[in-house]
Design a protein with these regions (language model features):
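Local beta-strand/beta-hairpin segments that build beta-sheet-rich folds
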Residues: 512-516
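Active-site and adjacent substrate-binding regions of carbohydrate-active enzymes
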Residues: 2-510, 520-536
Length: 536
């Protein structure tokens, strides 16, 4: 297979399409039911033929897997379930041979409770240098029986766990993920060495998990709703960390993308200053409902908040933490909110898929970079996981009220007629999460043979985006359009029209149709919930 044409600019990341791989669910090379690096290596040609520019891997490091690998025990070792460090290096090399860059995940807010540092801290006792790398504190109350403060966990419950000697340690997520103390020089030094470790092995970039949570109020004061500053979100000191990281990345020509959930546009933009992160995820677009006015406002706001720091926007519809797009868009309320996930809400998958196809063309036409989550190119819906098969700690921490995120993490279907749809080969074990019985229709081989499939749409759209200089980084100009319709031009006369109205609309005159997300009406009009790319 010929290597894809490289992206057009030196700053490739400004307009790249980056594919997210959740290794545990991507492809199983040894047939044990869990995805691994052998499976990734075998399926890299799929990503090259899809037309993406880079591949982001969620954590593949040694981990007890309490939180899907986001509880890292050793950044310099690959978890045995996935393979070896040698295999990871081969993934990086073989991806490069196919024209694909590799981005790895770093989780700097916390480590696993099985990390050598935390085990040392538990053994060392109160007041020890080993405990200073974390947030150990005596409790409140007459006998220290109460947590040191009232901070709520990201996964429900308290952020504090007591150890046998009476002290408590902080964990914004699960008790198995103790938070690091970023005012400690060992913590900063270790992460800088980890960055160099992976940059030396050829990775092109790093995605930073929970990027706004690292630094904490040194006095660990109680949380008050609306307090400014927040005691552990977006403290000013965090920017010193990212300035030091940027200097390291610049030595290698590598890039950063931050997971930054912030409602304040000005505070968000600070992370994207020229000496900090290159890009950050745009979650407002992901959470936006399928409504024309809301989408246009979100697009405008996103471009405006990036403009002062000259950073490219990123566009994402789905990831390993949120309800899949085809399901969300098939509901009456099409927005996404972690506090209101609408579990069990019926979804019209035919409608949701039609909208997801249109959303794909909208997203790929916007200026900046795009992230695709594995299975988006197949139109996978959210899966219902039986209660006895749920593995996400979010479910257990919520007392069972939150089904968790497993429904968007179900293993990929590759071959319609194979056991487990080819996830683990012909003799593979049962996958770690159950696949729905009707997923043969979503399999890669079946969609590859169908010119009208979601996969065919993505391959065509990505090929056009790569070949057309007007797409990617650049400008966007809105066009006059009927109510319920989004229409804008990019450079070189490229036009995108998305019909979110209740009826068909006329396409602009004197334009050539390049691609549509669905068939046009017999009269040549654009149906509802359909998008088109045209050239003047």
């Amino acid at each position: 297979m010929a290597a894809p044409t490289p992206t057009r600019t030196t700053d490739w990341w400004r307009e790249a399409v980056i594919y997210q791989v959740y290794p545990r669910s991507f492809a199983d090379g040894d047939g044990d039911g869990t995805g691994d690096l052998a499976g990734v290596r075998a399926r890299l040609p799929h990503l090259a033929s899809l037309g993406v520019d880079a591949v982001w891997f969620t954590p593949w490091y040694a981990s007890p897997m309490v939180d899907g690998g986001y509880d890292v025990a050793d950044y310099r070792a690959i978890d045995p379930a996935f393979g070896t460090l040698d295999e990871a290096e081969k993934v990086i090399t073989e991806a490069a041979e196919l024209g694909l860059r590799v981005i790895v995940d770093i989780v700097p807010n916390h480590v696993s409770d099985q990390h050598a540092w935390f085990r040392e801290a538990l053994a060392a006792g109160p007041g020890s240098p080993a405990r200073a790398r974390f947030h150990f504190r005596p409790g409140r109350g007459e006998d220290g029986e109460l947590p040191p403060n009232d901070w709520p966990s990201q996964f429900s419950g308290s952020t504090w766990t007591r150890v046998p000697d009476g002290e408590w340690y902080l964990h914004l997520f699960t008790p198995e993920q103790p938070d690091l103390n970023w005012s400690h020089p060992d913590v900063r030094r270790e992460h800088e060495e980890v960055l160099r470790f992976w940059f030396e092995r050829g990775v092109a970039g790093v995605r930073i998990d929970s990027a706004a949570l690292l630094t904490k109020d040194p006095e660990l004061r109680d949380f008050t709703e609306g307090s400014d500053p927040h005691p552990y979100i977006d403290l000013d000191e965090i920017h010193d960390v990212y300035r030091s990281w940027r200097a390291i990345a610049d030595e290698y020509g590598a890039v950063f993308v931050g997971e930054v959930w912030l409602p304040d546009a000005e505070r968000f933009a600070r992370y994207l200053r020229p000496d900090e992160l290159h890009t950050a995820f745009n979650f407002n677009f992901l959470a936006c409902p399928w409504e024309p006015d809301r989408l246009r406002r979100t697009i405008d706001d996103t471009l405006a908040e990036h403009a002062p720091v000259h950073a490219p926007a990123t566009w994402v519809l789905c990831n390993h933490d949120v309800t899949r797009t085809a399901t969300r868009y098939g509901r009456t309320d099409t927005a996404f909110d972690f506090a209101a996930k609408r579990f069990g809400t019926p979804a019209d998958l035919e409608l949701g898929t039609r909208r997801a196809r249109a959303a794909a063309l909208l997203t790929l036409a916007l200026p900046g970079s795009v992230y695709l989550y594995q299975g988006e190119e197949l139109g996978l819906p959210e899966a219902d996981i039986p209660l006895d098969r749920i593995q996400d700690p979010m479910h257990f921490r919520s007392g069972g009220t939150d089904p968790g995120r497993d429904g968007c993490r179900v293993p990929i279907p590759w071959e319609a007629g194979a056991p487990a749809y080819g996830f683990g080969g012909d003799a593979g074990a049962e996958p770690w999460l159950p696949q729905p019985a009707d997923w043969a229709r979503y399999a890669v081989d079946r969609q590859s043979a169908d010119s009208d499939s979601m996969l065919a749409l993505y391959r065509t759209a990505l090929g056009l985006r790569r070949s057309e200089p007007g797409f990617g980084d650049g400008t966007l100009t809105w066009l006059p359009a009927p109510d319920g319709v989004l229409a804008f031009t990019r450079d070189d006369g490229l036009t995108c029209v998305v019909n979110l109205s209740d009826g068909p609309v006329q396409l602009p005159a004197h334009h050539t149709l390049l691609l549509a997300s669905g068939p046009l009406d017999p009269a040549g009009t654009l149906p509802t919930d359909t998008a088109a790319w045209l050239r003047a």
